Amino acid sequence: RDRLRSRGLGDVYKRQVMGKTSLAAFISVCPKIDTVKIKGRGQRSIDSFVEYVKKEFPQIKTITVCETMEEAIRDSDIISTTTCVGDKEILFPYIDEKWIKEGALVCMPSAARFDESFYLDKNTKLVVDNYKLYEAWAEEYPYPSYDPVQIVGCKFMDLLHDKKITRDEIIDVADVITGKLAGRENDKQRIIYSVGGMPVEDIAWGETVYKRALELGIGVKLHLWDEPELH
């Protein structure tokens, strides 16, 4: 369903660049967002983030710096986590499912710790950017893979390993985009979207930046070899 009416964003971040770019992405597709709630780590980075929002998105009417995760998450239509975490799930920032409103999108290019009941709830939809990416991670980092990889889609794979969910409960976003599978099915459904990152996106952006540099006549050409080692 169309969620362009989303108005509130709760941003829990420690990686500030990712927090900023995530916010820009959300606003590009949800232009009615007028409230941003922030939970950061240090005052300097929080101040920098607030200034960024004021400068880049003057349409944002309310910017709230939150003292707790709960304050940032409650009543938010979109929840974004860009956190740095420890090497065990028990050390990941905890998010109580009771804080997450019905119909919210939880967008995660990082890790957090949820109660298992949240993942298994019939009103929670598990979505990944590319299922085969997580399949490869699960092979490279054997169960439990969420600890070392620290992307929430790996938690989905751990639940699949434990037979607590089935393969068809992990939705590939490409299938939603192409209409093969449904996205949001009702206004109460909460979606947790795992963003692992895909090399094809890096290649596409790399080409865009390269062509732009050629147009502007900037950059430095590097001499990598006289002839390739393998030919």
Model-derived segments and spans:
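Short acidic low-complexity segments
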Residues: 61-75, 93-95
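Rossmann-fold NAD(P) dinucleotide-binding segment
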Residues: 86-104
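A short, aliphatic-rich alpha-helical micro-motif
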Residues: 72-74, 99-100, 120
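Hydrophobic/small residue at the entry helix of a nucleotide-binding pocket
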Residues: 18
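Short, well-ordered coil/turn residues at beta-beta hairpins
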Residues: 80-83, 108-109, 129
